[in-house]
C-alpha cells in the first residue's frame, strides 16, 4: 500500500473512537522498523533504543490527535522520535559515551578499503558516523540512511536547510577522512 494511503488510513482509523486502537496498531506496524533504526543510530544500544521507541509510540498515542496535517504523518512521527532520542541523550549524557568498541568487526581490518567486504565497510561506516558531532551525525543519518530530503530533515530537526547542507557536507568529509585512515 502506498505510504500516503497508509497515512490517510491511519489517521482516519485513529480519529474514530471505535477504530482508534486499530489505527494505532497500523501506525505501530507501519513505522516501528524505521523508527527503531532512526533512534538506534542516535542512541546506539538496543536496550535503550527499545525504551525510546516505546516512549515515541506512547507520545504518538497521546498526541496524534494534535497532528495538523501541515507535513506528512511520517515526518511528524520522525520528529517525535528525534526529539525523544535527543531528550534521552540529554537525560543520560553521563552514561551515554561514544563507545566504538560496541561495534565489533569479525575480521582483521585491511589497510585498503577496496579489499573489504560489504559487511566490513558497513561496520567501518557506523564507527565513522559515531565519531561525528551530534548535529552532523543526525543530519548524515537522516540524509544517507533514511534518504530524507533536506526539507524533511528541516521539519524533523528544526535546523535551516543551509545549515543541514553544511552539516551533511562536513559529515561526509570527516567520514571520508576516517575511512581513508582505516
Enumerate the predicted regions with their spans.
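Short helix-capping/turn signature of helix-turn-helix
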Residues: 30-33, 41-44, 141-148
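Structural recognition of an alpha-helix C-terminal capping motif at a helix-to-coil junction
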Residues: 51-58, 71-83
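Short, charged helix-capping/linker segments at alpha-helix termini
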Residues: 17-26, 36-55, 161, 181-182
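DNA-recognition helix of helix-turn-helix
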Residues: 86, 136, 142, 151, ...
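Short amphipathic alpha-helical boundary/capping segments
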Residues: 9-16, 124-132
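Arg/Lys-rich amphipathic alpha helix in sigma70-family domain 2
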Residues: 66-68, 79-99
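Internal acidic/polar
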Residues: 3-7, 95-122, 149
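N-terminal module of bacterial RNA polymerase sigma factors
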Residues: 1-33, 152, 181
Amino acid at each position: 500500500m502506498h505510504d500516503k494511503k497508509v497515512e490517510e488510513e491511519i489517521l482516519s482509523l485513529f480519529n474514530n473512537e471505535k477504530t482508534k486502537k486499530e489505527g494505532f496498531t497500523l501506525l505501530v506496524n507501519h513505522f516501528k522498523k524505521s523508527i527503531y533504526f532512526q533512534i538506534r543510530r542516535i542512541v546506539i544500544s538496543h536496550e535503550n533504543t527499545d525504551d525510546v521507541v516505546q516512549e515515541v509510540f506512547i507520545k504518538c498515542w497521546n498526541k496524534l490527535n494534535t497532528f495538523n496535517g501541515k507535513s506528512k504523518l511520517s515526518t511528524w512521527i520522525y520528529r517525535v522520535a528525534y526529539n525523544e532520542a535527543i531528550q534521552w541523550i540529554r537525560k543520560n549524557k553521563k552514561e551515554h559515551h561514544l563507545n566504538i568498541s560496541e561495534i565489533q568487526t569479525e575480521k582483521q581490518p585491511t589497510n585498503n578499503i577496496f579489499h573489504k567486504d560489504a559487511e566490513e565497510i558497513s561496520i567501518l561506516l557506523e564507527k565513522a558516523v559515531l565519531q561525528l558531532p551530534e548535529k552532523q551525525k543526525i543530519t548524515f543519518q537522516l540524509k544517507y540512511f533514511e534518504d530524507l530530503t533536506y526539507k524533511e530533515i528541516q521539519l524533523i530537526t528544526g535546523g535551516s536547510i543551509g545549515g543541514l547542507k553544511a552539516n551533511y557536507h562536513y559529515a561526509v568529509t570527516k567520514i571520508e577522512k576516517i575511512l581513508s585512515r582505516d
